[in-house]
């Protein structure tokens, strides 16, 4: 009886081992097929993509994108970050007046852009004053210009 049981156990172990080995071999085969399939499919896909693209397509695409972006951009003034006449200014780099305009201060770093500064306004340079005369940080009358009343 013992020998029969031993034979049965031996048969079962053999059958189980053979099933496991076939499972492993089928798993390996499936993995190899997947790897081979993906490599060939990938290379075919790359070949198809490169066949469809011509040399002239890329520069035209880039050129049209640049043109559309340029059309969407606002016109940039000659000086960046400058204010036009009548706008807020502060006599700083970030809020300065454009061109020959001058910032007429009304308070501490608070002013508006004007053509030139009137008499008794704060100035640094003579060119900022309408009279072209800046003394002691104030625009002064020009003694050489006389206003003749009618």
Curated annotation (Swiss-Prot):
Q: Which GO terms describe its cellular component?
A: extracellular region
| KW Cytoplasm (keyword) present | no
Location within or outside the cell: Secreted
Where would one find the signal peptide in this protein? Answer: 1-18
Which keywords belong to this entry?
Disulfide bond, Glycoprotein, Knottin, Secreted, Signal
Keyword Isomerase on entry = no
Q: What is its main location?
A: secreted
Disulfide bond entries: 116-130, 123-134, 129-139
Domain observations = The presence of a 'disulfide through disulfide knot' structurally defines this protein as a knottin.
Q: What is this protein called?
A: UPF0506 protein SJCHGC02380
Q: Which organism is it from?
A: Schistosoma japonicum (Blood fluke)
């Amino acid at each position: 009886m013992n020998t029969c049981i031993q034979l049965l156990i031996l048969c079962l172990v053999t059958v189980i081992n053979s099933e496991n080995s076939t499972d492993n071999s089928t798993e390996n085969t499936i993995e190899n097929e997947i790897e081979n399939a993906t490599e060939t499919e990938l290379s075919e896909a790359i070949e198809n993509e490169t066949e469809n693209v011509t040399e002239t397509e890329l520069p035209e695409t880039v050129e049209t994108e640049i043109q559309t972006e340029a059309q969407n951009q606002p016109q940039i003034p000659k000086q960046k970050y400058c204010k036009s006449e009548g706008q807020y200014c502060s006599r700083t780099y970030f809020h300065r007046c454009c061109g020959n305009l001058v910032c007429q201060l009304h308070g501490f770093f608070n002013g508006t852009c004007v053509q030139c500064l009137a008499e008794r306004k704060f100035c640094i340079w003579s060119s900022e004053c309408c009279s072209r005369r800046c003394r002691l940080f104030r625009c002064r009358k020009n003694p050489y210009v006389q206003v003749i009343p009618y």
